[in-house]
Amino acid sequence: MKKWNQENCYIHTPYYINFASSNDLVRMSAPKIVREELERGNLIGAKYIMTHLGSSKDFTREEGLKMTTVGIGQILKGYKGATQLLLEISAGAGNTIGSTFEELKYILNHIDILIYGYEVGICLDSAHMFASGYDIKNKDGFKKIIEIIKKTVGLERIKLIHANDSKIELGGRKDRHDHIGDGKIGQGGFVNLASVFKCDFIAETKDDKVEEDIRILKDIRNNL
């Protein structure tokens, strides 16, 4: 990180992670894979590791949430490293787990009981939130979202923002990133996010304009 003049380093787990898969191999290997990523992250000094939670396609919602909670508990059992695990909110496609703050609250509350003294954080993806029906574009809608967060996971649990515009309309339940200002959210949504969340923002957009996305995000933060 010193070589590249980076203050912080973040790692994303593989996208095939699924704590609620009906495939025993996929479900049972997920905790081991994420734990290994955590340990590697700790070795290189990564601040956070974020993971998707998967989908409960062949189980009820309650069963999927319980399996996810058990899996995350297995990841953290005995873990003493400094790198913190973050759960990423999903876009709500199909039967994906963690597309609402209520579901994330359920998972966090049960993890807090299983692994006393370790705090799991949350990674917000702006495109995922918008696709799940959270209107971060509208100021009044955004205020309501902040109140929901306060009553569920808590603002203090939000550790990182994936700053992506969305090609999908509000509530469209698909994960399609767009460049900042080019999608359905617009720059105003990122002004809303930056006005509340002072954590790092990461652009997950295509290489053709990612530098422009970063410039826009920096301008937004500098002009608040």
Which residues fall in each region the model found?
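Terminal, non-globular segments
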Residues: 1-9, 16-17, 24-27, 79, ...
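Short, electropositive alpha-helical surface patch
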Residues: 1-5, 25-36, 61-74, 100-109, ...
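Short, well-ordered coil/turn segments that N-cap beta-strands
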Residues: 3-9, 43-47, 80-84, 116-120, ...
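Histidine-centered catalytic micro-motifs
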Residues: 9-17, 53, 124-126, 163-165
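Short, solvent-exposed loop/turn segments at secondary-structure junctions
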Residues: 16, 56, 92, 128-129, ...
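Active-site acidic/histidine proton-transfer and metal-coordination neighborhood
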Residues: 20-121
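Acidic/histidine-rich catalytic cores of soluble enzymes
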Residues: 74-177
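A short, acidic, flexible beta-alpha connecting loop/helix-capping segment that sits on the rim
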Residues: 200-211
